[in-house]
Amino acid sequence: MITRNYETLYIIRPDVGEEQLEQTISQFRTFLEEQGATKLKVQNRGKRRFAYPIKKLREGYYILMTYTAPGTAIAPLERAMRLNENILRFMTIVLEEETETEDAEEENPVLARA
């Protein structure tokens, strides 16, 4: 099974309690682990103000998850987020593989014209 690096950012309603916030975060962490995700890192970015109202709310808790998982794990995760009433928005992106572009740039420096 091919695994890729993913990053999922989701926003939780601001009116949830601290206990329910932690419960929601651990729910999705456990869900990904059950789907075979590895190298899972979860960052609580805290409560932030939106640029525009989302579902009549002006702020929310931003949670960022970075992980390696098979492609089949993403659709069930996003479906679970869509069905969870505490999640306002979510987005999953595929992270590019780490390349050695910095080393390549050093080997072929760009010459400036005089």
From Swiss-Prot:
Keyword Aminoacyl-tRNA synthetase: no
Gene (UniProt): rpsF
Organism: Thermosynechococcus vestitus (strain NIES-2133 / IAM M-273 / BP-1)
Role: Binds together with bS18 to 16S ribosomal RNA.
A Pfam family annotated for this UniProt entry: Ribosomal_S6
Assigned protein family: Belongs to the bacterial ribosomal protein bS6 family.
Lineage of origin: Bacteria, Bacillati, Cyanobacteriota, Cyanophyceae, Acaryochloridales
Descriptive protein name: Small ribosomal subunit protein bS6
Taxonomic superkingdom: Bacteria
GO molecular function annotations of the record: small ribosomal subunit rRNA binding; structural constituent of ribosome
